[in-house]
A protein has these predicted regions:
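Gly/Ser/Thr-rich loop/hinge elements
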Residues: 1-51, 78-84
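Stable alpha-helical elements in mature extracytoplasmic
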Residues: 3-7, 52-56, 65, 102, ...
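Sec-exported extracytoplasmic/periplasmic mature domains
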Residues: 9-16, 49-50, 61-65, 144-152
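Terminal peptide-recognition signature
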Residues: 11, 41-44, 60, 103, ...
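C-terminal recognition in membrane/secretory proteostasis and scaffolding
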Residues: 20, 117-167
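Extracellular/periplasmic catalytic domains that process cell-envelope and extracellular macromolecules
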Residues: 34-38, 61-62, 85-87, 99
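Short, well-structured beta-strand/strand-turn elements
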Residues: 63-76
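Conserved P-loop NTPase
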Residues: 80-84, 91-125
Length: 167
C-alpha cells in the first residue's frame, strides 16, 4: 500500500487515496498532498489487477484523473496480517477492508473499467499475457486512441532495428 500511495501522490490531486476499516469500525486514511503531475491518463486494468493496483485504479477513477481501460479487476480489497507461532507454523488473518476515496468496498467485487475492452485470447495464448506485442494488445491500443495518440508499433529487438536501418 505504501508504494501505491507514493505513486498516487505523483499523479492525483490532494485527498484520500484509500481508507481501511477494521472489524471494530476504526478507519485509517492514507492521504496525499496537492503537488502532482496533471497529465492525461489511461490505466489498463483486468482480472489480474488486484490489491494495491486496484486501490490506485479506484483512486484514479474517484478523482476523475484518468480513464480505466480493460476488464473488471480481481476484487482483492482486504488487509491481511501474518501470525507466526512458536512451533514454526503460521496463518494469515484478515484485519481490515480497503475502501476507495468514494467509500466503495472492492473486495470480491472488483472495479469496472470506464471503457471495457477484452484482450484477444488467441494472442494471449500465443504470446503470453506478459509478452503480448503492442499491436496485438487491444486494451493498450484503445488507451492510446482515447489519449489521442498514435498506435504503438511492435517493439523491435536491437538486431531487428539494425537490420531495418541497413535496408
Amino acid at each position: 500500500v505504501d508504494t501505491c500511495v507514493k505513486m498516487a501522490d505523483l499523479i492525483l490531486p490532494e485527498g484520500v487515496v484509500v481508507s481501511m476499516k477494521d472489524k471494530d469500525g476504526n478507519v485509517t486514511e492514507e492521504k496525499i498532498d496537492d503537488e502532482y503531475y496533471d497529465v492525461p491518463m489511461a490505466v489498463l486494468v483486468n482480472g489480474y489487477s488486484a490489491s494495491a493496483s486496484e486501490i490506485l485504479a479506484g483512486a484514479i477513477r474517484d478523482n476523475h484523473a484518468g480513464l480505466l481501460v480493460g476488464t473488471k479487476t480481481f476484487g482483492k480489497g482486504i488487509v491481511q496480517s501474518s501470525l507466526e507461532f512458536a512451533d514454526g507454523s503460521g496463518m494469515k488473518v484478515t484485519t481490515a477492508r480497503y475502501y476507495t476515496p468514494s467509500g466503495e468496498c472492492i473486495h470480491e467485487i472488483g472495479i469496472e473499467p470506464d471503457v471495457e475492452v477484452e484482450l484477444d485470447e488467441d494472442a494471449v495464448t500465443r504470446y503470453g499475457i506478459n509478452n503480448l506485442p503492442h499491436d496485438h494488445d487491444a486494451q493498450l491500443q484503445k488507451a492510446i486512441e482515447l489519449l489521442g495518440g498514435t498506435p504503438v508499433l511492435t517493439t523491435a529487438t536491437p538486431d531487428e532495428a539494425d537490420a531495418a536501418e541497413e535496408k
